[in-house]
């Protein structure tokens, strides 16, 4: 038939296969009539096809025909259901919350209204719960602060109302405590200055009132003392002129005497070397 679309799949692309295996047969497709339509008004096996096993081709089909999303929410192939859920009417999505495939539920977590999104807070798959933590209303977010996955809790710490952050200041994972330290208010921030993880203390040092930095001048990690040198008042800076680390000494000198020329090789600050330094 001369009116059929020609396949535009690039050379060397993944071969077109039916999602159940075997070749794609347009004659048995419910959307066979689309083959006679031009360009994005139609469909193309190997390029934009709802029968294909390749998710990219399914996605292209629904981008060409988003109005067909509702009709495929119960399709037996999970990739079709997941991609159809991106385009379906939102009010149709709550019925899919118990879908057996996490790929589908992940798409739901990106689109569900808040009233239904909370139902995915106990999803068995971490990626779904992470998306929930990224979108859940702050007033409801606290339900995820004790999630077993640190990635979920990290997003909670990024978005939880500041007044509730002290509840996460003792999180067992230091990455979560870093996020808490980036946002928590005094006096709870002061407690994190004594955290067992250096990166948490460093973030706390970058935010503490300058008058309280004196308690960190003997911190065992040079990065924490360097943050102190960046912000402390002159009285504290003078004590850091004899610090064991050249980076810290150089920063203290630079802040005490910003126009003073470098007088010795030891006065030259090395480039910031990160967590592996010394």
Please provide the spans of the model-predicted regions.
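N-terminal alpha-helical scaffold/docking segments in eukaryotic complex subunits
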Residues: 1-94, 98, 102, 226-278
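Long, contiguous interaction/recruitment modules in multidomain scaffold/adaptor proteins
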Residues: 19-22, 26-29, 123-124, 129, ...
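Structural detector for internal amphipathic alpha-helices that build alpha-solenoid repeat scaffolds
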Residues: 41-61, 78-90, 95, 103-114, ...
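Repeat-mediated protein-protein interaction surfaces in helical alpha-solenoids
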Residues: 64-68, 138, 162
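Alpha-solenoid HEAT/Armadillo-like helical repeat scaffolds in large eukaryotic proteins
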Residues: 68-76, 94-103, 111, 118-124, ...
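Structured C-terminal portions of repeat-based eukaryotic scaffold domains
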Residues: 209-210, 220-222, 233, 265
């Amino acid at each position: 038939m001369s009116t059929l679309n020609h396949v535009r799949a690039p050379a060397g692309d993944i071969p077109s296969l039916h999602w159940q295996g075997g070749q794609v047969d347009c004659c048995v497709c419910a959307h066979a009539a689309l083959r006679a339509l031009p360009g994005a008004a139609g469909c193309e096996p190997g390029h934009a096809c709802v029968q294909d096993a390749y998710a990219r081709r399914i996605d292209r089909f629904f981008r060409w025909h988003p109005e067909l999303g509702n009709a495929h929410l119960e399709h037996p192939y999970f990739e079709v259901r997941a991609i159809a859920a991106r385009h379906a009417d939102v009010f149709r999505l709550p019925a899919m919350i118990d879908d057996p495939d996490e790929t589908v539920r992940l798409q739901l977590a990106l689109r569900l209204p808040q009233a239904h999104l909370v139902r995915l807070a106990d999803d068995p798959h971490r990626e779904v719960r992470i998306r929930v933590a990224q979108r859940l209303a702050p007033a409801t977010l606290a339900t995820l602060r004790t999630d077993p996955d640190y990635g979920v809790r990290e997003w909670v710490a990024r978005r939880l109302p500041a007044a509730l952050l002290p509840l996460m200041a003792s999180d067992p994972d230091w990455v979560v405590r870093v996020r808490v330290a980036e946002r928590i208010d005094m006096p709870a921030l002061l407690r994190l200055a004594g955290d067992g993880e250096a990166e948490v203390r460093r973030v706390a040092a970058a935010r503490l009132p300058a008058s309280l930095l004196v308690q960190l001048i003997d911190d065992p990690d040079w990065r924490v003392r360097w943050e102190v040198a960046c912000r402390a008042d002159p009285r504290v800076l003078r004590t850091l002129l004899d610090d064991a680390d050249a980076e810290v000494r150089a920063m203290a000198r630079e802040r005490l005497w910003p126009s003073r020329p470098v007088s010795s090789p030891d006065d030259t600050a090395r480039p910031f070397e990160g967590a592996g330094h010394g």
